[in-house]
Every structure is written in C-alpha cells, then in structure tokens.
C-alpha cells in the first residue's frame, strides 16, 4: 500500500530485502515508504486513487505509556495515552518514535477509536530488535514517546455484506482484534458471522481468545480457531494443527 517510484532525490532504504517489493518493482526503482528515510527533498510517483486518501489525517503527538500486560511469553500489550482523542479506523497502525532507536517503528493498533486517547499495541519481542528491546526492557510506565498516525488502508469496511474472516499470527493479532472489536461495536455481527483464525508455532504462543471472548456473540457469531504447527509430543494440544 505504501509503494512508490523515486523520480529524483536521495533516500536511505531501511530494509533492502523487504518482501513487499518484487524484482520487477526493484528494477523500476520502486520503494516502500514505510521502509525508507528521506535524505533530502524527493520527487516521487505514487498511486493517488481514492482508497489512498486518508479518512483520518495523521497527526504527530506525544504519548505516555500507561500500562503493560503480558499476552504470551514474548507478546505484550502496551497501552499509551494521549491528551487528544484516539481517532483511527479498525485495522490501522501508528508510528512510534522510541528513545535511542533512531527510526520510527510501525505497530498495529489493537483497540478501537475512543475519546479517552487510548492507543493499544500488541507487540512481539524480536530477538536483537532495537525497537522491541526499548519497549520490553527499557521503557517504563509514565515514560513518553512520539506517536504519529493513524496510517494504513487495510481497515474494516463496514459496508460489505459478507461474513468477516480474520487471519492472524504472532503480533499480527493486533489489527485483527481491532477489526473484530470494530465489527462488534458497529453492530455488524447481528446478521453475519466473524471467523477468526490464529496461527502459532507452539501451544504457548497461542493467544487471542481472551481479547475476543468479551465481544457480544462470541462462540455463536464469532468463531475463534487457533492452529499450531508444532503441537508437541505430549498430546496436550487438542486443537487444530497445520503448517
């Protein structure tokens, strides 16, 4: 969604091998805006279709860390609060400026828009990751970071009449939980179903049910299906398996 063609200027590519670009894209000088840093003025060519026009204008603001909760052994929910309302669409993300990291990090939101200014992120620890090292090991409740957003076009379409299918794995849980919560709040599940599939490596990596269970219709119109690829040899896992 953030693909563009560089016409003139210089930039730094933060992730040269990002899977969002094909070899054809690279030959044509295309880049991913979320993985680039401008080194000066740029001229670019990008799609300007109506789907890329922000429904909510991104805004930079200061956010205070208000709470941390463990979801699994390596997945945590970080709750930030801003002075202004948290205005975003279910499924969108925001950029966090973390102290000492140098570059912003993009993290999906897990909650829904609210007037209390609460922004919830469900983030998985990345081994040797600079951003998650700060979040997991350095940042304390009460500390402030920069927050820029919202961004993203993969948000909940409330006008689609079909059932909703959410597929997530790892920290990809966050945007799907946001979409499920948004669908429930909008009353979309009164006449349709939501199927939520969560893939994990082992049983201890599974989560998501606790976030979905409070929603109206859970177990009836909301179906949660966890799947693991390494169930173990003890026979304790009784759920679905797959690769």
What are the functions of these language-model segments?
Residues 1-32, 36, 193-243:
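Reductase modules of NAD(P)H-dependent flavoproteins
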Residues 53-143, 162, 200-202, 227-231:
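Ferredoxin-reductase
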Residues 177-187:
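Histidine-anchored nucleotide/phosphate-binding helix
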Residues 163-179:
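A phosphate-binding catalytic loop at a beta-strand-loop-alpha-helix junction
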